[in-house]
Structure formats: structure tokens, C-alpha cells
């Protein structure tokens, strides 16, 4: 179906994509963030991150382009697609590959298999909940393409404008590596914004085992990212707890946006010590 990745150009891949869509009478659906990859250099970069004979979960099969090349290298590819029309296309495109299992369903709702890698051009509208699910399922490695703005949030450090709940929760579980920026021209149809490819490797030790506590604490804190810790703690946890963390030399005058991951974990541990309920 597809030529060798080293021998194909972006124009070739675009033409193949257009022909497949025309053949099956499929139009990309904007509400499902359907932008099909047509850049062989991007595909090669993704393939280079995944060891041979890996077991892979792909979120968003599309017409099966990336799936096809992953299947040539992987031991097994589970690929999830919500759009029934695209399931029909991908089933035909990938019919000769016995190591590919196509799953029709919502990636947020179905159970995931145990895999070595997750690979996906993550749909913008479900990026955050998908990453949370990755963490909860203990996905050890991932290569994801996300909108540039989301990528900056994932990579952001304390004090920066992009820093927030998603930065903290993801960095608690994963070491995140920036691979490369990807322009709109690498997809069809071209999205309005650039994307970025990131590689995520599970930390040997998570900063905190109870993800729910981290979610609850960051939810409280980042409702008021520009307020002081003193103000937030006093409002939600009371003055007795405020006095306790002050006695521990916790910087209560810092702004929420400046709290690094280590400080947030300390705050959670103080809550546990004092039996403070995180609502």
C-alpha cells in the first residue's frame, strides 16, 4: 500500500492520502481533530524512537499510515479509532498485517492492553485526559505529537506562563524530551497551528504514588495561580495548617505559579501528616 519510508516524499504521501480518502468517500472531521500525517520525515523520527519488536498502542488510527510503518517494526500494534468510516479504511489498508489489531472505540472509555509504547498524534480536545489515563495505566514510554501550545505546557517549569496542573502531573510520572517542532504542512488537512513531538519515559520512582492526591492538590492551587500560598492555604485548609507548614519553613509567601514539583509534593505530605482532607 505504502512505499518504503526512505523512498517516499511528502507529495507522494499526500497523494496517497487524498486517493484513499476519495476511494472510500471519507472527509476529515474537524470535531475529531482529524489531521492525517503526510510527512515521511516525521514518521521516520517516530519509528526511530520505538525499539524493534515492541508492543505498541496507537491512539487514532486514521487511514492507517503510521500504523502501517509501525507494523513493519513492531511485534504487535493495537490501534484505536473512534470513527467507524476510518475503521473501514484502515481495515482494508492493513488487511495483510496479522500483528495489527484495530479497536473501534473511544480511547478514553475503553480498557487499554499492556504495552511497551504508546504512539499518537493526540487529538487536541482530549490531550489532557489521555495523558492522565496514560499515567493511571502505567504506560512506560510514549511518543506523542501534540499542539505546540500543549507541548509547551507539558515541558513548562515553575514560574513560566505555561506552567500548570498538566505540567506538574505529567512531570511527576515522566521524563519528557522535546524531539522536534512540526509545521502544519506535515498534515492533511493542515491544522492552524504547529505541533511538537515529545518522547516520554516513565520515571523509576514517581514523585508521589497517589495520583488522585496530586490531582486534587493542583486543582485547588491552580484555581488561584497568582495568589500566595498563604492565601490559598488559609482559605482551603485553615490557619492551623498554615501555622504548621510555616513552622516547617515552607515559603508561604511564594505565588502558586512559582511552586515547583518538589514543593507541591511536600505540601501534600504535610496534608497527610496533619490529616487534612483534600476536597
Where are these regions (language model features)?
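Catalytic cores of RNA-modifying enzymes
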Residues: 1-220, 257, 262-279
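Long, well-ordered amphipathic alpha-helical subdomains in the mid-to-C-terminal portions
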Residues: 190-193, 200, 210-250
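Interdomain hinge/lid region at the active-site interface
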Residues: 253
Amino acid at each position: 500500500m505504502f512505499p518504503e519510508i526512505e523512498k517516499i516524499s511528502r507529495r507522494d504521501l499526500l497523494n496517497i492520502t487524498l486517493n484513499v480518502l476519495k476511494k472510500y468517500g471519507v472527509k476529515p472531521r474537524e470535531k475529531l481533530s482529524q489531521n492525517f500525517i503526510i510527512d515521511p520525515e516525521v514518521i521516520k523520527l517516530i519509528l526511530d524512537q520505538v525499539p524493534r519488536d515492541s508492543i505498541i498502542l496507537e491512539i487514532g488510527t486514521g487511514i492507517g499510515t503510521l500504523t502501517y510503518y509501525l507494523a513493519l517494526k513492531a511485534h504487535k500494534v493495537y490501534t484505536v479509532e473512534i470513527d467507524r468510516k476510518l475503521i473501514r479504511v484502515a481495515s482494508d489498508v492493513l488487511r495483510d498485517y496479522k500483528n495489527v489489531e484495530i479497536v473501534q472505540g473511544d480511547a478514553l472509555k475503553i480498557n487499554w492492553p499492556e504495552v511497551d509504547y504508546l504512539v499518537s498524534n493526540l487529538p487536541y480536545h482530549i490531550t489532557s485526559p489521555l495523558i492522565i489515563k496514560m499515567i493511571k495505566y502505567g504506560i512506560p514510554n510514549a511518543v506523542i505529537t501534540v499542539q505546540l501550545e500543549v507541548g509547551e505546557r507539558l515541558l513548562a517549569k515553575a514560574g513560566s506562563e505555561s506552567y500548570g496542573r498538566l505540567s506538574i502531573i505529567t512531570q511527576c510520572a515522566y521524563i519528557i524530551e522535546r524531539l522536534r517542532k512540526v509545521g502544519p504542512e506535515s498534515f492533511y488537512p493542515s491544522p492552524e497551528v504547529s505541533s511538537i513531538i515529545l518522547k516520554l519515559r516513565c520515571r523509576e520512582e514517581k514523585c508521589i504514588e497517589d495520583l488522585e492526591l496530586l490531582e486534587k492538590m493542583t486543582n485547588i492551587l491552580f484555581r488561584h495561580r497568582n495568589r500566595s500560598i498563604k492565601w490559598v492555604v488559609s482559605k482551603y485548609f485553615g490557619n492551623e495548617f498554615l501555622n504548621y507548614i510555616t513552622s516547617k519553613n515552607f515559603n508561604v509567601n511564594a505565588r502558586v505559579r512559582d511552586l515547583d514539583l518538589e514543593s507541591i509534593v511536600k505540601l501534600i505530605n504535610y496534608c497527610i501528616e496533619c490529616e487534612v482532607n483534600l476536597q
